[in-house]
């Protein structure tokens, strides 16, 4: 297993055919105390990271060296992301370090952030389950409408009074919208149940989906789907807070508390509908890379251009702090961490580095520690990765490529590429003289 992980990380650094950074499939490294993490190992690694990278430090935990390799890989290729199994909501009471099947009790994240773990109909596990569907709430629209309604109720224009009233209207709108979404998800679930097992031959016949192996091809999937999750999602938390308070939840404590309370309201609805229908409802910090732009276009058309709200091409995802806010990486992590505990349907915290991370991989490890300490469930570390399409150089490129000296739009003479070892005249005639291109290259 360790060999496979090492080779996977090595291949990720090498990239695709021409060194391109592979974006998918997403890789996730699990951080777990006693397995791939200890404070003692962290201190030793930070003290002399060059030795840690070279494998010259004997660590206490068996896989801390793989975490070091994962940090090195992230510093070059953006992945892997990091899953923190010691976050209180990610722990499993049956997990034991001496259990060879302990992976069954470890949470797994699908795709960008979807989390499937808690289960009303069986043991808490990610195995044999998935998300059935989710619907996302447009928080900025609810906030804009709340401010308009509050403004009509308080015509004297007292900003404090209007914002206070708008907050209450907004939270009630969140409750009503979440309730409507929960009913919509149930209606869709009832339709999904009528699908036949033969429509999912691989998943059902191989028992990939828990209980599917018991079904005959023409059986409806029915109760087999009850292990899946139904997500009440949301986007645009930052923009919604700007609509009410004139600033985001990174700089306004009142805005932060309002957004936190809004997600708490969603969780109350989730608990209500878990009891009502006996299904695995959850709150999801929606991965809305496409939907956020669509919502913004719709709202700009309806309400016009509102600074900080509808004046960009997209809404900020879920509870994320806007990357343009003047906060440090540590502050961003601390602001977002409490939301992970109340978005059990899935979440992620991104941080952005502005330098060339490959020259400072210890910074990745230090960020991992902050995420571990602050209770992040799932985190990702982004940084600039430029690639020259001609010579293949990967790193930060300014006006001139540091490898071949090319400027944007320019070509590079073949003679220069040959000197750099980046071009060889392989063809049907010359290949016999050079031997195998792969070996020589």
Where are the predicted features?
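Conserved catalytic cores of very large enzyme subunits
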Residues: 1-226, 247, 252-426, 431-434
